Amino acid sequence: MQAKSARKKVRSLRIIIVGCGKVGHTLTEQLVREGHDITIVDTSERVVRDTTEMFDVMGIRGNGASLNVLMEAGLQEADLVIAVTGSDELNLLCCLMAKKNAKCHTIARVRNPLYNKEIRFIREQLGISMIINPELTTAREILKVLKFPSAIKIDTFAKGRVELLHFRIKPEMGFDGKTIMELMGRLK
């Protein structure tokens, strides 16, 4: 009888990455390392060739917003489409085409600050699973550090309405081993 592995095997996902610049390249590298089945789409023949040789992934040269290109990349079998080209509009259109023509999740990188107030509307109306603005996310993380400089970790819940702060406490502070009710009594 063979011993069962303590680690649960994660199902390999079929992922299409549109745009193989720095972010697309890094995503490809990480997701291949995790054992996922990756297809990249880029307009540059050189980028497609270099990336497919480096990571042993499938590559398609073309415009990721084209339904024909997405179908050639395996859209019908894809679990996830990630669009990280240099164009916000292309990323959104790519995800819209994928969402409307297949049953897969979609992630679009959108960097233009003009869209920040419209992200929820865009996500809900277009059916995009996730929209990521890396610059906005970075700015928010920096603000958290500035707001709570002594926190060693800050977790955010409820769409940013709740923050859980992790602090390192010293024995002389008198907080160690106390319940929240006991601490609340000390603060009144």
Task: Mark where each language-model region is.
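Cytosolic regulatory regions of ion transport systems
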Residues: M1-K188
